[in-house]
């Protein structure tokens, strides 16, 4: 009975993700020179990521990526995939600006902060601003890791899930045309598909069980 209630609450939580997170200490992007920026990224290299994250032996470590609209539209979707359970969340962002990306991060953290210990992302401009780094590490106290350039396989879980999302919203789809609710309904369908890697359980079921055990 408790599991059923939690599943319903989780579905409601996902469907009702707001377009902005709860208010946090306001941060501003600080200008950094290219060399300093390079060092900020290199010191957070995926090669420094602990083995317990690499081998998926612990819960709460997420891969994130951007799923883009056409070039004439700034809106895009940031996807979050928990590595151990393959559970996926998507949040719309108005643009790739540091402020709009931070708003999307705040939205995600407003629901999943307690089950997020680290984030691994690529080196796209939306994820390498000083505001993004300070938001993840200073505001929320999470570890941040960057994959190597041109290495999508280092975030293979996220890439595979994004391909499934693209079957619903093909390349070139303009995400300004959908609501956050419609996006999450599509992602919920993905989360309810049994996975061989999860012994034919669904990401939603495995994720929910982990939350209950926390």
Regions found by a protein language model. Name each.
Residues 1-54:
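Basic, flexible linker segments flanking DNA-binding modules
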Residues 59-69:
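Two-metal-ion RNase H-like nuclease active-site motif
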Residues 67-89:
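Short conserved beta-strand segments at catalytic cores or DNA/RNA-binding microdomains
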Residues 65, 80, 86, 105, ...:
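Mobile genetic element proteins and their domesticated derivatives, centered on retroelements
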Residues 70-73, 90-112:
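Active-site beta-loop-alpha junctions of metal-dependent nucleic acid enzymes
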Residues 121-123, 129-135, 144-168, 177-187:
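RNase H-like two-metal-ion nuclease catalytic core shared by retroviral integrases
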Residues 139-140:
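Short, structured coil segments at secondary-structure junctions
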Residues 133, 171-214:
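C-terminal domain-tail junction helix/linker
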């Amino acid at each position: 009975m408790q599991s059923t209630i939690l599943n319903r609450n989780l579905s409601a939580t996902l469907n009702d993700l707001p377009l902005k997170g709860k208010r946090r200490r306001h941060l501003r992007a600080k200008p950094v020179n290219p060399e300093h920026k390079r060092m900020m990224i290199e010191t957070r290299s995926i090669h420094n990521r602990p083995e317990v994250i690499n081998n998926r032996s612990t819960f709460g470590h997420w891969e994130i990526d951007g799923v883009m609209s056409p070039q004439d539209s700034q809106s895009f979707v940031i996807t979050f995939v928990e590595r151990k359970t393959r559970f996926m969340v998507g949040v719309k962002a108005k643009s790739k600006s540091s402020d709009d990306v931070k708003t999307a991060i705040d939205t995600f953290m407003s629901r999943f902060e307690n089950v997020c210990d680290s984030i691994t992302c690529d080196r796209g401009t939306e994820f390498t601003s000083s505001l993004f780094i300070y938001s993840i590490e200073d505001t929320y106290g999470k570890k941040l890791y960057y994959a190597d350039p041109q290495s999508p396989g280092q975030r293979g879980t996220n890439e595979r899930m994004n391909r499934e999302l693209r079957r619903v919203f093909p390349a070139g789809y303009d995400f300004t045309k959908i609501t956050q609710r419609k996006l999450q309904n599509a992602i919920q369908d993905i989360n309810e598909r049994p996975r061989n890697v999860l012994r034919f359980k669904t990401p939603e079921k495995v994720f929910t069980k982990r939350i209950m055990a926390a």
